[in-house]
């Protein structure tokens, strides 16, 4: 039986939390094509639906991809445009991991027609559903807030030098949301000095933040990148670690509450 493309729990607040990289499902026949290095799916945003599960009780809509980012990357521009010029990002269908290991066995790398097929089968339906949720929330409230949630290992030399701060908030340099929304998010995330915070630093926002964040139309988007060491053991990322996750969840609760309660100022 084919897995659905997303887990979707609809809420009644203006907030939508999108988690595009936590999926681990592979379509039939895909696993056999992967290299030994790629089969553990090392670039997965592990356990983010668990980390944010509380948000549904605050009225947030929660949408999370079920399929691995190695099938297709839902936070990449399908036309190949990069939102991080000069950074060696993986593409719509990656052929190497963040550690430069080959994802596919020899002779199994997808060709252009296979990449286009994945775009049509997986990328487009997922974004159609996400756009529908944003439109529904906007129609109900007059504005919508998208939190595009991600996580990553603390050190990924391919993407950045040194250790990434614990929490990285991106607003496309202020273009994807109202300034007061970004400030509300900063205040919520900065309340606990345990976790270091960066705002529009190395992480500014990927495809979803750039595409859906149109504040002049009442559509606001933020990208949050969480260092995985803040909520799990990076040596064993497949294991959920409640002892590490719970303190971070307290910070994320403040963030979710701030985004749910935020309202644009009347013109």
Language-model-derived ranges and their functions:
Residues 1-146, 151-267:
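N-terminal catalytic or cofactor-binding beta/alpha core of small enzyme domains
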């Amino acid at each position: 039986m084919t897995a659905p493309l997303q887990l979707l729990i609809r809420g009644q607040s203006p907030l939508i939390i999108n988690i595009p990289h936590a999926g681990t499902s592979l379509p039939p026949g895909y696993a056999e094509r992967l290299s030994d290095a790629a089969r553990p799916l090392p670039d997965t945003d592990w356990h983010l639906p668990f980390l944010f599960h509380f948000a549904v009780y605050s009225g947030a809509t929660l949408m999370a991809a079920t399929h691995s980012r190695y099938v297709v990357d839902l936070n990449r521009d399908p036309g190949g445009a990069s939102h991080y010029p000069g950074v060696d990002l993986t593409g719509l269908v990656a052929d190497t991991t963040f550690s430069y290991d080959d994802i596919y066995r020899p002779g199994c790398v997808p060709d252009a027609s296979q990449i286009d097929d994945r775009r049509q089968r997986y990328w487009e339906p997922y974004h159609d559903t996400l756009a529908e949720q944003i439109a529904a929330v906007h129609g109900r409230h007059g504005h919508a807030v998208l939190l595009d949630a991600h996580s990553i290992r603390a050190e990924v030399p391919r993407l950045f030098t040194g250790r990434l701060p614990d929490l990285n908030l991106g607003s496309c340099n202020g273009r994807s949301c109202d300034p007061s929304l970004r400030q509300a998010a900063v205040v919520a995330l900065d309340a606990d000095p345990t976790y270091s915070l960066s705002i529009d630093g190395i992480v500014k926002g990927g495809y979803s933040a750039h595409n859906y964040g149109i504040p002049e139309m009442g559509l606001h988007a933020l990208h949050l990148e969480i260092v995985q060491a803040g909520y799990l053991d990076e040596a064993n990322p497949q294991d959920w670690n409640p002892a590490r996750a719970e303190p971070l969840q307290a910070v994320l609760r403040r963030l979710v509450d701030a985004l749910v309660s935020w309202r644009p100022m009347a013109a």
